[in-house]
């Protein structure tokens, strides 16, 4: 099963355009600009076609895209995760451009069975503490401006510290003018728990009880697909609960990597590092693409497939498990608009739990697989598109798609 995480909004540096990242037409394929979601759907279509072709050529040594009854017309499961801000736009986009949420029928031209997994986890932004602001502005590395500009910046920072102290450090951030910006997604760790909380995983396992593996990836990892060779490698190392894909690190790769802590190899998030320049010691970057063995992961949550019918038990198990993972506090700017072109920008604090921290748990059996950059590199900013086009990454993505 192909699991695409699309919780992001206001990303790919849309300069405040409010675009859902998954729906951003970032590059031209087949003579037409395609969105991130279009690319991932077309990759699923190509994967199923290749499996069918191999199945026809070699009936004994191929990977079959079949159901329990042996039918060869059975689309690849493609689950798209959403948040409270992205669910409706993505649902409307699929209805307009991909004939809705395609089901498993003989006339399914997309060769994929697309489902939406609606996010059930949400957070409320808070007023940061003065200590948080001082750490962000005074203790972390910052560019020094010319004397006059630096005075203006220091004055503005001082005013924001006074605002945080007067409003109430650590209190809830509330803005009646734009209530949605008071809420925030709580990190991509919750994408898998959301599958259980909203019943998506339960329904999929009931429809296809032979399902054993999930492949989780970010929407901006455009080269990730269900590669039969990688899947075979994952199955061969059958003891792993999670298999993370990593890529050779380059200077622009920020956000964490593969490291060794207390003689244990694990993923280290950038937010967990004491200094920003510590990230430069990593040789491998975390692509966030993860192969998940379903039953073993459920066992780590103290659950089984049959337990997924009990919503209260699932919620309690997930809540207890989440307490074992670190929680990060990040500062995010929000705009308070007063009208007539006047607005103020305030820093707010939000908390996040990150999926890669699953590797920090001692009982979590994790393996790590080095893959080429064309498969694991992420597109975070439009400035990356030129290099992405020139180094052959775009050509590789086009070769694994069927538009």
Residue ranges, per PLM feature:
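Residue-level signal for short, function-critical loop segments
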Residues: 6, 84, 372
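Domain-scale recognition of functional cores that engage charged ligands
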Residues: 1, 10-356
């Amino acid at each position: 099963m192909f699991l695409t995480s699309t919780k992001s909004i206001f990303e790919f540096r849309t300069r405040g355009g409010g675009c859902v990242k998954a729906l951003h037409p970032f590059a031209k394929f087949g003579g037409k600009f395609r969105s991130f979601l279009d690319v991932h759907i077309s990759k699923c279509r190509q994967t199923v076609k290749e499996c069918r072709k191999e199945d026809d050529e070699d009936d004994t040594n191929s990977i079959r895209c079949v159901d329990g009854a042996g039918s060869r017309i059975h689309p690849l499961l493609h689950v798209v995760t959403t948040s409270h801000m992205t669910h409706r736009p993505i649902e409307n986009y699929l209805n307009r451009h991909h004939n809705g949420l395609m089901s498993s029928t003989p006339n399914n031209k997309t060769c994929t069975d697309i489902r939406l997994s609606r996010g059930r986890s949400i957070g409320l932004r808070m007023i940061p503490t003065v200590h948080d602001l001082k750490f962000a502005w005074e203790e972390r590395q910052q560019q020094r401006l010319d004397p006059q500009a630096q005075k203006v910046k220091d004055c503005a920072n001082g005013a924001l510290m006074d605002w945080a102290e007067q409003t109430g450090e650590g209190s809830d951030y509330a803005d009646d003018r734009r209530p949605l910006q008071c809420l925030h997604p709580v990190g991509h760790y919750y994408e898998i728990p959301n599958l259980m909380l909203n019943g998506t995983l339960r329904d999929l396992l009931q429809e296809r009880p032979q399902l054993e593996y999930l492949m989780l990836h970010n929407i901006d990892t455009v080269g990730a697909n269900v590669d039969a060779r990688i899947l075979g490698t994952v199955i061969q190392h059958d003891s792993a609960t999670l298999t993370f894909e990593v890529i050779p690190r380059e200077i622009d790769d920020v956000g964490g990597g593969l490291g060794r802590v207390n003689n244990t190899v694990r993923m280290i998030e950038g937010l967990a590092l004491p200094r920003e320049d510590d990230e430069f010691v990593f040789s491998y970057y975390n692509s966030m693409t993860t192969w998940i063995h379903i039953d073993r992961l459920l066992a780590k949550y103290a659950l089984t497939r049959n337990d997924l019918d009990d919503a209260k038990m699932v919620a309690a198990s997930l809540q207890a498990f989440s307490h074992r993972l670190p929680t990060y506090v990040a500062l995010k700017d929000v705009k308070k608009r007063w009208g007539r072109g006047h607005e103020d920008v305030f820093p707010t604090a939000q908390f996040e739990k990150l999926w890669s921290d699953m590797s920090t748990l001692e009982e979590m059996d994790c393996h790590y697989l080095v893959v080429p950059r064309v498969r694991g590199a992420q597109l975070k900013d439009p400035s990356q598109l030129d290099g992405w086009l020139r180094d052959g990454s775009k050509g590789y993505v086009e070769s694994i798609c069927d538009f």
